[in-house]
A protein has these predicted regions:
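Gly/Ser/Thr-enriched, mixed-charge loops and adjacent short helices
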Residues: 33-136, 142, 146-152, 163
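A generic local secondary-structure boundary/capping motif
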Residues: 11-14, 26, 46, 98-99, ...
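Phosphate-binding and adjacent anionic-ligand microenvironments
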Residues: 135-202
Length: 202
């Protein structure tokens, strides 16, 4: 049964990730596929992009010498179902859990939205949710791209530095990430928050 998620962009994030709707095109013209992704067929996908985003997508596609080599999505979903949410959580937990030492005991965490995806990820990772005595507080802003925490910016950067540098889903080098404006990469604030809990200094 479909359900609403805490933020519209988070909902689109899950929908687009599971719809394989993203393509990264390097400045050299090389197309890199992420999350098992395929280029979005704009005429069939449910979320609308602005004229500016459509123009950027068109320019990037035109820069690729063999456009026929870019597979197109067969279609999308109109809603976010429980199965898609579960698949997002499964995949993200699998990737993030490999970042941490198995002996590391996560610090109790407080989160602003106890029903959100971040809470689901933390629970699956064995992180105790403790609103009263938490050593770390996390909040994902409504646009789904910004993580706020009780740690300083420098501590966050230090904790996530290697994880961000080695994550296969983060494009490297100059290029253009072609996407629906609602698409959030798998290095979004939700997965970043979960990774921070496992990697932050105790």
């Amino acid at each position: 049964m479909p359900r609403a998620l805490p933020a519209p962009l988070t909902a689109f994030s899950v929908r687009m990730v599971m719809a394989d709707g993203a393509l990264y095109i390097r400045s050299s013209g090389e197309a890199l596929i992420y999350l098992g992704g395929r280029a979005v067929d704009r005429s069939r996908e449910g979320a609308l992009a602005s004229e500016a985003e459509l123009s950027l997508i068109d320019e990037a596609a035109a820069a690729v010498s063999d456009e026929a080599a870019l597979p197109r999505a067969e279609g999308g979903w109109e809603c976010v179902g429980e199965g898609m949410i579960g698949a997002y959580v499964d995949r993200t937990v699998s990737r993030i859990s490999s970042l941490s030492d198995a002996a590391h005991v996560p610090t109790p965490v407080s989160v602003e939205d106890p029903t959100g995806l971040l809470t689901s990820l933390l629970e699956r990772l064995g992180v105790p949710i403790d609103e009263a005595g938490a050593g770390l507080s996390l909040h994902v802003c409504c646009e789904g791209r910004t993580l706020c925490s009780s740690l300083s910016e420098e501590q966050v950067r230090t904790a996530l530095g290697e994880a961000l540098a080695t994550s296969p889903v983060i494009p490297a080098g100059r290029g253009l990430y072609c996407m629906d404006p609602a698409f959030v990469m798998d290095a979004d604030a939700i997965s970043a928050g979960a990774a921070l809990v496992l990697l932050a200094p105790r």
